[in-house]
Amino acid sequence: MKAVIQRVSEARVEVDGSTVGAIGRGILVLLGVEKGDTERDAAWLAEKMAGLRIFEDDAGKMNLSVREVEGSILAVSQFTLAGNCAKGRRPSFDTAAPPDEGKRLYDRFVDLIRETGIPTATGIFQADMKVHLVNDGPVTFILDTKSRSSST
């Protein structure tokens, strides 16, 4: 699984001109599911997301998690994160999980985040979405479950 996470002061996702998910302060996560990803990957990523200290404390140091600042998470599926642009001019999506598996693991990731008690909004899997956000910082990170160490 690959995730692009952005610290936001607000974010929303629209489908067909209607807002389907919105948050105030928190994290926008764009999630791509790849072939070979498992529920273990979803669990690792959900745990990492809930505890990642990317919000500033009173001293201005990134020392607080989304839970500690009483923020929210907006999770948006984005299969293009599995795209490979190494050859030619058109991305290859050969490594993207099939839609049924991608949806199952995306839904599992969302369920696991919600189980932490963090308010979580979502987009709609496979929909053509418009994502609006105010990136706070900007603060953006890329997480890849395939490159995690065994100690994290």
UniProtKB/Swiss-Prot annotation:
<keyword id="KW-0694">RNA-binding</keyword>
<feature type="short sequence motif" description="Gly-cisPro motif, important for rejection of L-amino acids">
    <location>
        <begin position="137"/>
        <end position="138"/>
    </location>
</feature>
<dbReference type="InterPro" id="IPR023509">
    <property type="entry name" value="DTD-like_sf"/>
</dbReference>
<dbReference type="GO" id="GO:0000049">
    <property type="term" value="F:tRNA binding"/>
</dbReference>
<dbReference type="GO" id="GO:0005737">
    <property type="term" value="C:cytoplasm"/>
</dbReference>
<keyword id="KW-0820">tRNA-binding</keyword>
<dbReference type="InterPro" id="IPR003732">
    <property type="entry name" value="Daa-tRNA_deacyls_DTD"/>
</dbReference>
<dbReference type="GO" id="GO:0106026">
    <property type="term" value="F:Gly-tRNA(Ala) deacylase activity"/>
</dbReference>
<dbReference type="Pfam" id="PF02580">
    <property type="entry name" value="Tyr_Deacylase"/>
</dbReference>
<comment type="function">
    <text>An aminoacyl-tRNA editing enzyme that deacylates mischarged D-aminoacyl-tRNAs. Also deacylates mischarged glycyl-tRNA(Ala), protecting cells against glycine mischarging by AlaRS. Acts via tRNA-based rather than protein-based catalysis; rejects L-amino acids rather than detecting D-amino acids in the active site. By recycling D-aminoacyl-tRNA to D-amino acids and free tRNA molecules, this enzyme counteracts the toxicity associated with the formation of D-aminoacyl-tRNA entities in vivo and helps enforce protein L-homochirality.</text>
</comment>
<protein>
    <recommendedName>
        <fullName>D-aminoacyl-tRNA deacylase</fullName>
        <ecNumber>3.1.1.96</ecNumber>
    </recommendedName>
</protein>
<dbReference type="GO" id="GO:0006399">
    <property type="term" value="P:tRNA metabolic process"/>
</dbReference>
<dbReference type="GO" id="GO:0019478">
    <property type="term" value="P:D-amino acid catabolic process"/>
</dbReference>
<comment type="similarity">
    <text>Belongs to the DTD family.</text>
</comment>
<comment type="subunit">
    <text>Homodimer.</text>
</comment>
<dbReference type="GO" id="GO:0043908">
    <property type="term" value="F:Ser(Gly)-tRNA(Ala) hydrolase activity"/>
</dbReference>
<dbReference type="GO" id="GO:0051500">
    <property type="term" value="F:D-tyrosyl-tRNA(Tyr) deacylase activity"/>
</dbReference>
<keyword id="KW-0378">Hydrolase</keyword>
<keyword id="KW-0963">Cytoplasm</keyword>
